[in-house]
């Protein structure tokens, strides 16, 4: 009887110990080297609130990488004609840099290259000032935009083979990297529907994958000369038909074979918003570092995070560094996002799922399991 009581007591103590023990956390640098956040750069008017957001929201959650979609929201000195009407000054940017440095956050500026040179009926700064760079100048800009349309117009592209385009673009790439004191640059390059069009006098009829790879490589080599990395979105490198992923998060226009033509030190930002697709394994096996990028579905974001950690842990040691981390994406302006974030606004059009909800959910889980 005495022996039975001792055994029972030991079981009770063990049970209580298991219930009260803290979850053994692992170093975040080991679990997820990149813990990112991607958002549009603020306007000058909202700079102070954005700095507060960095200090009070990003830093405590252990975000260590901030990709800022700057585009033409900067007072470029090298190409002043490409400035937006309301753009950040050098002094404004230095405040962002200081806030990031104080919180050990790596800041990476983004300017969309190749695609996304228009939006709906609005032509972007580059093609507005340099219409000769347009890949499809014969496509009329609609007064009232709708999708789908007969021209397959989503966003315009510049022609990567125009002899003057890089002499305009590379000075602003260098300038924005310099002012942000950045060792990397995000070139976008997602959702490129117009490329190698038959009517283009320079690239018509050419292999679209080779054109895409050529532009990636040209940008990469320019950055490498200054010891900077190139980051891009990964959708054009996935076969949308074979995978069933479609024309947005993958390619329908045969650019996917460029994955075997571009430098292996390009960092791939792999975005999938409705499913936890296993494409990080594809990119890692091709030799790239890959970052998974969710948007507005918290459960998908957490599933993707768990996949990334599992891939990293269970792969051969040569593969482990390729699984680089996670980056929450925001596709509204920073002002709209911060309003929605602080007021916890709901999105009735997406079953209540929001980008601020995904950000909270993802980083709550990241900080639960790591330190």
Residue positions per predicted region:
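Bacterial Sec-dependent N-terminal signal peptides
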Residues: 1-26
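Flexible loop residues that form catalytic
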Residues: 9, 42, 71, 273, ...
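Secreted/extracellular small peptides and ectodomain modules produced from precursors
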Residues: 3, 16, 36, 198-201
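Electropositive, surface-exposed helix/loop patches at the edges of structured domains
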Residues: 99-121, 140-172, 268-288, 325-371
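Aromatic-lined carbohydrate-binding surfaces of glycoside hydrolases
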Residues: 38-252, 258-260, 266
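Catalytic-core regions of glycoside hydrolase
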Residues: 179, 201-359
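N-terminal hydrophobic targeting/anchoring segments and the immediately downstream early-domain regions
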Residues: 22-56, 60-61, 65, 136-139, ...
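Extracellular/periplasmic carbohydrate-active domains that bind, remodel
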Residues: 19, 87, 95, 285-287
């Amino acid at each position: 009887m005495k022996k039975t009581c001792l055994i029972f007591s030991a079981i009770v103590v063990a049970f209580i110990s298991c219930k009260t023990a803290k979850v053994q956390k692992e170093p975040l640098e080991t679990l997820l080297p990149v813990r990112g956040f991607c958002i549009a750069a603020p306007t000058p008017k909202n700079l102070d609130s954005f700095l507060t957001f960095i200090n009070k929201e990003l830093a405590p959650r252990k975000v260590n990488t901030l990709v800022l979609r700057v585009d033409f929201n900067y007072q470029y000195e090298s190409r002043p004609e490409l400035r937006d009407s309301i753009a950040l000054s050098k002094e404004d940017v230095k405040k962002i840099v200081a806030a990031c440095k104080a919180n050990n956050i790596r800041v990476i500026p983004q300017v969309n290259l190749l695609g996304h040179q228009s939006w709906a009926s609005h032509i972007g700064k580059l093609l507005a000032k340099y219409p000769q760079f347009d890949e499809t100048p014969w496509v009329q800009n609609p007064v009232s935009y709708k999708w789908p349309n007969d021209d397959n117009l989503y966003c315009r592209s510049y022609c990567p083979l125009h002899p003057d385009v890089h002499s305009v673009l590379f000075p602003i790439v260098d300038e924005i990297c310099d002012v942000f004191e950045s060792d990397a640059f995000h070139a976008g390059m997602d959702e490129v529907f117009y490329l190698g069009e038959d009517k283009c006098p320079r690239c018509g009829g050419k292999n679209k994958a080779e054109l895409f790879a050529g532009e990636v490589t040209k940008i990469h080599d320019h950055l490498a000369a200054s010891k900077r990395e190139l980051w891009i979105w990964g959708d054009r490198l996935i076969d949308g038909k074979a995978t069933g992923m479609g024309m947005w998060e993958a390619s329908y226009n045969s650019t996917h074979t460029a994955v075997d033509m571009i430098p292996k030190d390009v960092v791939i930002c792999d975005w999938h918003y409705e499913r936890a697709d296993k494409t990080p394994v594809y990119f890692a096996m091709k030799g790239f570092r890959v970052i998974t990028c969710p948007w507005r579905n918290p459960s998908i974001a957490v599933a993707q995070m768990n996949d990334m950690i599992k891939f990293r842990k269970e792969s051969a040691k040569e593969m482990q560094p390729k699984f680089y981390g996670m980056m929450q994406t925001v596709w509204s302006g920073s002002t709209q996002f911060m309003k929605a974030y602080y007021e916890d606004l709901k999105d009735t059009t997406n079953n209540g799922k929001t980008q601020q909800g995904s950000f909270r959910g993802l980083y709550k889980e990241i900080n639960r399991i790591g330190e």
